[in-house]
Amino acid sequence: MTLFSSISSISNPMTSSKSIIASFGSGTIMSSNSIACGSGCGGGRGGILGLGLGLGLNLFGGSRGACGGNGGSGNPAQGGNGSCCGGPCCGI
């Protein structure tokens, strides 16, 4: 899905959040892994703000981005894909 690739390249958490919500409206929810790649990179690095903008994927302490696989101690939505944010290796 190129849609998630374009979302993950956005560094502004607010802009990223809006894009992710728009993508949900077009029915592109694939799995928690692919969504984590899209939201974790752009919206997951903003601490508390990022946790909220991650649309529930980073609510388990993952403030550094789910795509990086280093979001926290108990985040079940982590993709564990290494530092692949913005790249094609998010499993989409």
From Swiss-Prot:
InterPro entries in the record: HssA/B-like_chaperone, HssA/B-related
Entry-linked Pfam families: Coiled (PF05710)
First and last residue of the signal peptide: none
GO biological process, one term: sorocarp development
Segments crossing the lipid bilayer: none
Domain of life: Eukaryota
Family membership: Belongs to the hssA/B family.
Protein name: HssA/B-like protein 46
